[in-house]
């Protein structure tokens, strides 16, 4: 008799409530290559043993419920249940544990991040026996990742489309983010691209408001792109935000962008949802559009250390759902992001194979096989003095995005773009000559400013601007 139809008549049904750990805590279990593995930070309620808490997470995120049910006998729980197979205390934290859970692959629909998250981070996060719960990391088996298209194009294809190699790409978010007319918005796009940037960007909440409807914005931005390309001889782009109230409207906007001949569109993947994002990613691959992803709302989910979901999980999910760029923090700017932790999930976005490394917050070895990589975007409170650090931290396969750091230049938008391009070219040249960007960065920028008045003016404006705050979410102590 098959496991799917096997009954437990020989055992008999016994109604009632029993501890989760009797069924779902299995420290002897050896994980399979096909299992999805999860690392949860568990804070049990007082009096709840860690084994019971970990087992409860495994149960409530897979086959379990609060009481024994008769229909358990109509299937094989051993085949389908999640298993808490290891628990370790968190060093330096009281009553906090990392619980490792293995999920059989058959629990998940192929190619659906939506279904994966509905199971793993669904109801269990409101479970009363837990004071707090955080999903720290996932191991996605190759047998599951191969059911996803992933990024529409990936890093190498994007470079080939843009014909730009050997340096980070430069971007700028148009400010003020709300209130500009479509024509004035397009003017700012043109000035920034003409000044030397590769991309400009809609902000995450620019959709289709009364002051600037999406179609008008798309048309004026396309005009700006073509004019800047003609004058500079470089391929340019603007992230046209296709995010909308319905999937149908979102695709309609992407179709219009394709008809205009622009190279890239944008989506807010958390507020828009994974189903919408995956649909847009498939459209972009089929129609030759790059896809920029904004992570608006991520800090609601990932900023608190004890509860929610770490961004490295959201980053993996985005790579599976599909996107060619995603915002990933800056380390040095105004937004949250510890260096080693940020570099950990940057590698998870870009690389094919990433080894387990707890010093960078990576709980599992991850093999993406042939799935294309995602370019991390550094954006938020950065300016020309940050350029050496950003170039050193993120390397060539990145987008460095200066919004206020371009449009806030005292001479205007185009000079702001010139300043950033000169600073970047100086840093890349210095690095290629063997200079130490971390140690000599300020001197490299000062030297470049001697022959670039635009850069000199930018250096003067932002010479004392720093964002010196401790990150809320830090790596755990190792001992």
UniProtKB/Swiss-Prot annotation:
Species this chain originates from: Ananas comosus (Pineapple)
A GO BP entry: reductive pentose-phosphate cycle
Propeptide: 1-2
Pfam families named in the record: RuBisCO_large, RuBisCO_large_N
GO cellular component, one term: chloroplast
Function: RuBisCO catalyzes two reactions: the carboxylation of D-ribulose 1,5-bisphosphate, the primary event in carbon dioxide fixation, as well as the oxidative fragmentation of the pentose substrate in the photorespiration process. Both reactions occur simultaneously and in competition at the same active site.
EC number in record: 4.1.1.39
Name by which UniProt lists this protein: Ribulose bisphosphate carboxylase large chain
Sites of N6-carboxylysine modification: 201
Subunit field text: Heterohexadecamer of 8 large chains and 8 small chains; disulfide-linked. The disulfide link is formed within the large subunit homodimers.
Transmembrane segments: none
Gene3D superfamilies: Ribulose bisphosphate carboxylase, large subunit, C-terminal domain, RuBisCO large subunit, N-terminal domain
Cofactor binding note of this UniProt entry: Binds 1 Mg(2+) ion per subunit.
NCBIfam families: PRK04208.1
Reactions this protein catalyses: 2 (2R)-3-phosphoglycerate + 2 H(+) = D-ribulose 1,5-bisphosphate + CO2 + H2O; D-ribulose 1,5-bisphosphate + O2 = 2-phosphoglycolate + (2R)-3-phosphoglycerate + 2 H(+)
Residue numbers marked as site, Transition state stabilizer: 334
One of the record's GO molecular function terms: magnesium ion binding
PTM sites of type N-acetylproline: 3
Name of the gene: rbcL
Residues binding substrate, per UniProt: 123, 173, 177, 295, 327, 379
Residues given in the record as Mg(2+) binding sites: 201, 203-204
Cofactor: Mg(2+)
Further comment found in the protein's record: The basic functional RuBisCO is composed of a large chain homodimer in a 'head-to-tail' conformation. In form I RuBisCO this homodimer is arranged in a barrel-like tetramer with the small subunits forming a tetrameric 'cap' on each end of the 'barrel'.
Nuclease is among the record's keywords: no
């Amino acid at each position: 008799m098959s496991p799917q139809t096997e009954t437990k008549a020989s055992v008999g049904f016994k109604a009632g409530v029993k501890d989760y750990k009797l069924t779902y805590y299995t420290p002897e279990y050896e994980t399979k290559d096909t299992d999805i593995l999860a690392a949860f930070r568990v804070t049990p309620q007082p009096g709840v043993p860690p084994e019971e808490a970990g087992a409860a997470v495994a149960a409530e995120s897979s086959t379990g419920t609060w009481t024994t049910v008769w229909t358990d006998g109509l299937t094989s729980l051993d085949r389908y249940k999640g298993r808490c197979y290891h628990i370790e205390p968190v060093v330096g934290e009281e009553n906090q544990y990392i619980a490792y859970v293995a999920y059989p692959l058959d629990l998940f629909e192929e190619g659906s991040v939506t279904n994966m998250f509905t199971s793993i981070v669904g109801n269990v996060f409101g479970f009363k026996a837990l004071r707090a719960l955080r999903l720290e990391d996932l191991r996605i088996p190759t047998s599951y990742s191969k059911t996803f298209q992933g990024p529409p194009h990936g890093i190498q294809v994007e470079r080939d489309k843009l014909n730009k190699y050997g340096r980070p790409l430069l971007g700028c978010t148009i400010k003020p983010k709300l209130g500009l007319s479509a024509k004035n918005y397009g003017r700012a796009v043109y000035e920034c691209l003409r000044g030397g940037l590769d991309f400009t960007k809609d902000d995450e909440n620019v959709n289709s408001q009364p002051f600037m409807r999406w179609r008008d914005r798309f048309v004026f931005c396309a005009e700006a792109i073509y004019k800047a390309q003609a004058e500079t001889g470089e391929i340019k782009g603007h992230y046209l935000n296709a995010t909308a109230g319905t999937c149908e409207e979102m695709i309609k906007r992407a179709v219009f962008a394709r008809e205009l001949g622009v190279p890239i569109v944008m989506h807010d993947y958390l507020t828009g949802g994974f189903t919408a994002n995956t649909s847009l990613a498939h459209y972009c691959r089929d129609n030759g559009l790059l896809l920029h992803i904004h992570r608006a709302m991520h800090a609601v989910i990932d900023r608190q250390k004890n509860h929610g979901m770490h961004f490295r999980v959201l980053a993996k999910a985005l790579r599976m759902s599909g996107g060619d760029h995603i915002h990933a923090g800056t380390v040095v700017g105004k937004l949250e992001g510890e260096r080693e932790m940020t570099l950990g999930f940057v590698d998870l976005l870009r690389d094919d194979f990433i080894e387990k490394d707890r010093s960078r917050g990576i709980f599992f070895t991850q093999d993406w096989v042939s799935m294309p990589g995602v370019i991390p975007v550094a954006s938020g409170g950065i300016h020309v003095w940050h350029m050496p650090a950003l170039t050193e931290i993120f390397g060539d396969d990145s987008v460095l995005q200066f919004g206020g750091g371009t449009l806030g230049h005292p001479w205007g938008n185009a000079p702001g773009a010139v300043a950033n391009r000169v600073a970047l070219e100086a840093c890349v040249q210095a690095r290629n000559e063997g200079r130490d960007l971390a140690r000599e960065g300020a001197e490299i920028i000062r030297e470049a400013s001697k022959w670039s008045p635009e850069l000199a003016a930018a250096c003067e404006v932002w010479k004392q601007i720093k964002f010196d705050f401790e990150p809320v979410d830090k790596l755990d102590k190792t001992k």
